[in-house]
């Protein structure tokens, strides 16, 4: 069976994950004056939102492997991926800097200039200091990881394409075990100081588990392996609904695991199964609501949506009457309305950035160049997955 160039259902999944990130960040700035509603939102979303990071990193590895390296040029690949990442990161960073300077309020920084250089170079995730990775536009830390993944991808791709087909599942299992074990390794790190926003979590351990690019590379590699399994016709896993049920069961178990372990690590293998099972549906021509034109379009907007949504929530709340360190709260109807307004603004701005900034930049600077050993056409040219 010939493999399709595009996997539309994965685009739909990308947007659903971005929506979870949005609602998770909404819950951290409680709009609702009703404390019961705030608690009901925060209880699952504070746990579910970060899990989308695993999905996005796996998705990135999956779609890049699906596209492959058609011209076999590492330099061309690195250039295209860097241009695509910076096409939106730079303008959003500039707007963020202007807002921070206008308000004279650093975002987790000690001064308004904290983190500017590391954010500009997208190396903030390499520093175990929340004044760096939490400064400016805090969600951009994941792009710091993505650039590291891009740097490693040509070498990893060359290696895994040579792995024997009958050993792919063993590799996937080994990487899954490694990812689940990372919180145990983190216990070797100092237990103090704690995170400013979570006194029960040591700052260095949290950075190592959640931010450190080589650690998050495991999820990217797992996505690559699942793509190889699907490409080579070795998928024998459960269907999407069964994967969703399995994820729900494991997710419920995570609430019984201490926070300092990072319970979300337990869901990594299940997310990998869900990702591959949805992709297999596309390969087999199974129609899904995730693959409709609307969902695919929303998926294309996800990178821009991810980069702007937190700024709209954070500073929208600030301009609506909140102050630094204080989140104004509203009655339920007003809070619902403001949440919908924030989502609408984020989606509208992401559409503008995608069509009038990202795409023109890619047409001008990100166009593939022919190399002497150019090969076949890629199955697709994936966008940055976007992460919380």
From Swiss-Prot:
Q: What is its EC number?
A: 2.-.-.-
Region listing for Disordered, in residue ranges: 366-388
Pfam assignment, any one: Acyl_transf_3
Q: Which GO terms describe its biological process?
A: antibiotic biosynthetic process; polysaccharide biosynthetic process
**Gene Ontology cellular component terms for the protein in this record:** membrane
From the Swiss-Prot or TrEMBL record, what is one GO molecular function term? acyltransferase activity, transferring groups other than amino-acyl groups
The UniProt entry, under InterPro entries, shows: Acyl_transf_3_dom (IPR002656), Acyltransferase_3 (IPR050879)
**Entry keyword set:** Antibiotic biosynthesis, Transferase
What's its job?
Catalyzes the acylation of the mycaminose sugar during carbomycin biosynthesis. Recombinant strains containing care can use spiramycin as a substrate and convert it to the hybrid antibiotic, isovaleryl spiramycin.
PANTHER family in the cross-refs: ACETYLTRANSFERASE, ACYL_TRANSF_3 DOMAIN-CONTAINING PROTEIN
Name of the protein described by the UniProt record:
4''-mycarosyl isovaleryl-CoA transferase
What is the source species? Streptomyces thermotolerans
């Amino acid at each position: 069976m010939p493999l399709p160039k595009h996997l539309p259902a994965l685009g739909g999944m990308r947007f659903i994950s971005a929506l979870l990130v949005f609602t998770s960040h909404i819950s951290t700035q409680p709009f609702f004056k009703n404390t019961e509603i705030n608690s009901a939102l925060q209880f699952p979303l504070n746990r579910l939102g970060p899990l989308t990071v695993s999905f996005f990193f796996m998705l990135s590895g999956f779609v890049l492997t699906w596209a492959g390296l058609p011209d076999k040029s590492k330099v061309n690949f690195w250039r295209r991926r860097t241009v695509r990442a910076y096409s939106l990161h730079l303008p959003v960073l500039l707007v963020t800097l202007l807002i921070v300077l206008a308000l004279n309020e650093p975002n987790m920084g000690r001064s308004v200039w904290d983190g500017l250089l590391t954010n500009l170079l997208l190396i903030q995730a390499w520093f175990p200091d929340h004044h760096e990775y939490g400064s400016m536009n805090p969600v951009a830390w994941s792009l710091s990881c993505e650039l590291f993944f891009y740097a490693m991808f040509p070498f990893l791709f060359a290696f895994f394409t040579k792995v024997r087909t009958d050993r792919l599942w063993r590799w996937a299992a080994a990487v899954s075990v490694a990812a689940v074990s990372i919180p145990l390794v983190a216990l070797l790190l100092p237990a103090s100081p704690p995170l400013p926003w979570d006194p029960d979590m040591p700052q260095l351990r949290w950075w190592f588990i959640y931010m450190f690019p080589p650690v998050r590379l495991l999820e990217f590699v797992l996505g690559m392996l699942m793509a190889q399994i699907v490409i080579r016709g070795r998928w024998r896993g459960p269907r999407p609904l069964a994967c969703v049920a399995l994820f729900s069961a494991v997710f419920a178990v995570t609430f019984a695991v201490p926070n300092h372990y990072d319970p979300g690590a337990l869901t990594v293998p299940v997310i990998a199964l869900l990702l591959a099972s949805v992709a297999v549906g596309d390969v087999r021509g199974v129609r899904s609501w995730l693959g409709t034109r609307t969902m695919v379009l929303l998926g294309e907007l996800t990178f821009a949506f991810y980069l702007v949504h937190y700024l709209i929530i954070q500073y929208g709340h600030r301009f609506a009457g909140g102050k630094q360190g204080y989140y104004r709260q509203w009655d339920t109807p007003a809070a619902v309305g403001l949440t919908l307004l924030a989502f609408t603004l984020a989606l509208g701005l992401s559409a503008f950035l995608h069509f009038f900034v990202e795409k023109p930049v890619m047409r001008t600077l990100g166009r593939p160049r022919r190399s002497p050993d150019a090969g076949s056409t890629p199955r697709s040219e994936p966008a940055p997955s976007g992460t919380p």
